[in-house]
């Protein structure tokens, strides 16, 4: 099963009641195997992997909290993109700074959470300096509609993922303004 943790009590309650995150992405029903909690200790109990799905600005505090309760033995899957404000570090560099022995993989597209939730064919990169960390999450993500590819290029995957997000936002604005396919290209 999956333990989903949030420190926002109201969000945990809404998720339990609706069995979907009405904001990220809306309309995607969560499976019954997902358990919701506001306790990081409970969420990490027995975990074979820790998926960290927070904005980059929150990554440092989440990793510190996970270390306090779980140590370095369980690998992290990092989904955030971009650079940390102030330090300019990429997400994997934040982990390496805080916990040099930590195992981790970086998840990047090209993909959108909504497509994964709607079971549309999706390919993702799992970047890690050691393939075994990527393999843990590759097996957890394995579905007929999701394909994972291992990559050792942590900087390329991290910067590429951040750049893709900027382009995706610009493309969405272009589409919303009705600029057509030429502007999108």
Across the structure, where does each feature detected by a protein language model lie?
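Internal alpha-helical scaffold of NAD(P)-dependent oxidoreductase catalytic cores
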Residues: 58, 69, 94-103, 121-185
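NAD(P)+-binding Rossmann beta1-loop-alpha1 motif at the extreme N-terminus of oxidoreductases
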Residues: 1-28, 33-38, 65
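Rossmann-like NAD(P)(H) cofactor-binding subdomain of soluble oxidoreductases
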Residues: 30, 36-121, 137
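Short, charged/polar "capping" segments at the starts of alpha-helices
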Residues: 10-14, 85-87, 134
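Cofactor-binding loop segments of dinucleotide-utilizing enzymes, especially the Rossmann-like FAD-
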Residues: 7, 79-81, 129
């Amino acid at each position: 099963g999956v333990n989903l943790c949030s420190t926002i009590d109201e969000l945990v309650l809404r998720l339990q009641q609706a069995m979907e995150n009405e904001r990220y992405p809306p309309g995607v029903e969560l499976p019954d195997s997902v358990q919701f909690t506001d306790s990081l200790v409970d969420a990490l109990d027995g975990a074979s992997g820790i998926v960290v799905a927070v904005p980059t600005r929150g990554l440092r505090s989440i990793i510190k909290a996970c270390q306090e309760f779980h140590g370095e033995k369980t690998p992290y899957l990092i989904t955030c993109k971009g650079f940390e404000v102030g330090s300019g570090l990429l997400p994997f560099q934040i982990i390496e700074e805080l916990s040099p022995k930590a195992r981790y993989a970086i998840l990047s597209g090209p993909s959108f959470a909504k497509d994964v939730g709607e079971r549309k064919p999706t390919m993702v990169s799992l970047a890690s300096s050691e393939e075994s960390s990527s393999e843990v999450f590759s097996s957890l993500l394995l579905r007929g509609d999701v394909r994972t590819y291992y990559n050792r290029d942590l900087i390329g995957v991290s910067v590429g993922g951040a750049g893709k997000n900027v382009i995706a936002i610009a493309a969405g604005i272009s589409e919303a303004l009705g600029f057509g396919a030429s502007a999108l290209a």
